[in-house]
């Protein structure tokens, strides 16, 4: 009786995903994360609900969900690393028009820390395209967290850590000026809180990025941003 052919076995490929959280807020750090997972782990995490970190929404429940999933990712991934970029470093690089350069540098550091992988994927096609000349298995694309589980995992890890850091900042000021609503982004809720703080202290809080525009408090403190700012905040 002829033997049955062996089933085809596909390689369990290892992919490193890179993403950030906190590029846009006016308050607090930015966090970059890299996560290396194999295809089996990617499937497991996807079944457990892994998605782009923004898909979970805002608020305490969403933060708790992201933290739980980040813990699951850390337990299952081959490699997880994060870099926290403080507001002072962000300001220094924005003044030189180098925010994108800063992110590429941090991404390079994460890649060099990681084990050898089959593919590296970063979220942000234009932002990270230059790294393709340095790493032959590198690709960058927009909305990568929607298509690649490794990038979604990096997004969740980065966002969970960024939100944890922001919660620590909130607790510093809550008794004095009330909770910072709006996640520290330049939205109406954050603007109201900053207005309350500046009315009381006549200056921006320590964790505020000085290179971000604050027209809603300039009547109280003038423009406290550094001179000769080159705008590259969201490009």
Where are the model-predicted features located?
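RNase H-like, Mg2+-dependent phosphodiesterase core
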Residues: 1-235
